[in-house]
Each structure stands twice: as structure tokens, then as C-alpha cells.
Amino acid sequence: MESVSSRGGDPVVKPSMEVWHFQIAVYFAFGFFFLRLVLDRYVFQRIALWLLSTGSAPIKLNDAATRAKIVKCKESLWKLLYYAACDFFVLQVIYHEPWARDIKLYFHGWPNQELKLSIKLYYMCQCGFYVYGVAALLAWETRRKDFAVMMSHHVITIILLSYSYLTSFFRIGAIILALHDASDVFMETAKIFKYSEKEFGASVCFALFAVSWLLLRLIYFPFWIIRATSIELLDYLDMTSAEGTLMYYSFNTMLLMLLVFHIYWWYLICAMIVRLLKNRGKVGEDIRSDSEDDDD
């Protein structure tokens, strides 16, 4: 692909999106698989054992419940590392971009917006992670009661990522991804505190998670992001053509489906909040407990 330099010095990829670009996402997916294997064995296992051993009771490695908790702790360590790293990266990339703070600029210049190489790699990384995530849900991670919902979420996210990239909606796509990862950082941190029986840390992080979910996914996402795709986008699409109409309704339908998932999980979060208040600040079991009814 041909590239040029932007004023900020970051290479800019000309917006000639092609399907073969997603080979990079496939490479990322395989890379995540092998990286997870290495980290699980040599890093996360040791961290999980250390975290669980600092709890109130001595750790029993021959206990099935303890082994299950170690597996879940490693899952959360992996996800925390990924979400925190990705969010830090994309925030660094878009911090100085004027369109990051003005919804009227999300589509300004579309479809001939410049695609920085950093945003392209970020997109392919995220797409690869969710491709890996589908495989991990099927064959690796703890099977939880919301498996079908989570699988549907991952599939829709992959389709939305691919669609927004191929249609050059990558500005608003990067914002959406950053919003989602921010909440997940707090969620995985709260889980790690819970597994290590640090109730105060778990309660604080869960509260931050709930607030961030409400603000980012239930307020900012529908009233800023979906508003932009529903109203601002109309200034750039030819709604008299079949292509423009299909593009408009396809993109917004997928975003609304994500919002439905957000509302569903907010219901579960509210149930957790009720438990937390009843337990006087102690975070209870995750409503999304796994199929074997182990504590999450």
C-alpha cells in the first residue's frame, strides 16, 4: 500500500480499503494466541498464584475451586493487559486529533479522509483480537451463562470493525473502540481484586466500572456516537441511492445492536450493585457466573 507523511510525522495510508488488508488481522489473531500461551505459562500463572496466596485463607492447589479461580484470574490478567495497552495506545494517537472532540468532524472529508498507519494497525489489532476472542470463547475460556450473548457481541464487533474500515468510517470507529475498552479495564481490575480477596479494591474498581459503563456506553455512546451516525452522517451520504441507504441503515443497525447488549449487561450490573449494597460494600458473585456455577 502506498503511504505519505502527515503534518504530525505519522505515515498516512491512502484510503483505498481492500479486503486483503485483513490478512494483518489474521496475523494479529494468531499472534495473540501464541502470546497468550506464553504469558499464561510463564507470567500470569505466577502472578495469579501470588495474588491468591495473599488472601485470607491459604491457597490449596489440589482444590478444584481454587484451580478454577486461578484460570479465571489468568483470563482477567490477559484481558486487563490487552484493554489497558490498546486504550493507552489509541488515546495517545487521537489525543491531538480535532475530530476526537467534535462529533461534527467524524465524517468531515469522507470518504477521502486520511488514514494514519497507526489507526490502521489499531483497527487490524482490534479485529484480530476479536477473531481470537471467538476461538477463545469456544475452546479456551471459562464457559459462562452469557456465552451466547458474548459470542454474538464478538461476531457483531468483527462485522462492525470490518464494515467501518471498508467504508472509511475509521474515525468514529476508533472512538467507539476506545470507549468500550475503558470500561473493560475497570471490570477486569475489579475481578482480579475479587479473586485475590481484596474486597475494598474490588468494590472501588467495580464502582468505577459501573460509572464508566453508564457514562460511556449508555450516555455518550447513544447520545453522541449514534446521534452522529444518525444525523451528521446524512450530510455525506447520498440517501437517494441504494448504496447510501444500505450503508446508513447497516451501520446504524449494528450500532443499535451493540446498544442492546449494553442495556442487557447494565441490567446485570444493576443486580450486582444491589448485592453490593446489601453486602455493605462487598462485591458479590458475578451474575455472569460460569456454567458449572463456580464463583466468578
Swiss-Prot record:
Record field: transmembrane: 19-39, 80-100, 121-141, 158-178, 206-226, 254-274
Activity control summary: Inhibited by the mycotoxin fumonisin B(1), a sphingosine analog mycotoxins produced by pathogenic fungi. Activated by divalent cation such as magnesium Mg(2+), zinc Zn(2+), manganese Mn(2+) and calcium Ca(2+).
How does the protein associate with the membrane? Multi-pass membrane protein
Q: Which UniProt keywords apply?
A: Endoplasmic reticulum, Lipid biosynthesis, Lipid metabolism, Membrane, Phosphoprotein, Transferase, Transmembrane, Transmembrane helix
Cellular compartment(s)? Endoplasmic reticulum membrane
What reactions does this protein catalyze? a sphingoid base + hexadecanoyl-CoA = an N-hexadecanoyl-sphingoid base + CoA + H(+); sphinganine + hexadecanoyl-CoA = N-hexadecanoylsphinganine + CoA + H(+); sphing-4-enine + hexadecanoyl-CoA = N-hexadecanoylsphing-4-enine + CoA + H(+); sphinga-(4E,8E)-dienine + hexadecanoyl-CoA = N-hexadecanoylsphinga-(4E,8E)-dienine + CoA + H(+)
Instruction: Supply one GO molecular-function term.
Output: sphingosine N-acyltransferase activity
Report which superkingdom the organism of origin falls in. Answer: Eukaryota
The EC number on file is: 2.3.1.291
GO cellular component term, pick one: plasma membrane
Phosphoserine modifications at: S289, S291
Any Gene Ontology biological process: long-chain fatty acid biosynthetic process
Domain TLC, chain residue ranges per copy: 71-278
In the UniProt record for this chain, what is stated about the effect of gene disruption? Elevated levels of free trihydroxy sphingoid bases as well as ceramide and glucosylceramide species with C(20) to C(28) fatty acid, but reduced levels of species with C(16) fatty acids. Better resistance to submergence under light conditions, but increased sensitivity to dark submergence associated with declined levels of unsaturated very-long-chain (VLC) ceramide species (22:1, 24:1 and 26:1). Increased susceptibility to AAL-toxin triggering programmed cell death (PCD).
Query: Does the keyword section mention Acetylation?
Result: no
Which EC class heads this enzyme's classification?
Answer: transferase
- Short name of one Pfam family for this protein? TRAM_LAG1_CLN8
Q: Cite the record's tissue specificity text.
A: Expressed ubiquitously with highest levels in pollen.
Pathway stated in the Swiss-Prot or TrEMBL entry: Sphingolipid metabolism
Question: Any idea what job this protein has?
Answer: Prevents cell division in root meristems and promotes salicylic acid (SA) production and hypersensitive response (HR). Catalyzes the biosynthesis of ceramide sphingolipids with C(16) fatty acids, structural membrane lipids involved in membrane trafficking (e.g. early endosomes) and cell polarity (e.g. polar auxin transport related proteins); accepts only C16:0 fatty acids, but with a wide range of d18 sphingoid bases, such as sphinganine (d18:0) and palmitoyl-CoA. Mediates resistance to sphinganine-analog mycotoxins (SAMs, e.g. fumonisin B(1)) by restoring the sphingolipid biosynthesis.
Q: What is this protein called?
A: Ceramide synthase LOH2
What taxonomic classification does the UniProt entry list for its organism? Answer: Eukaryota, Viridiplantae, Streptophyta, Embryophyta, Tracheophyta
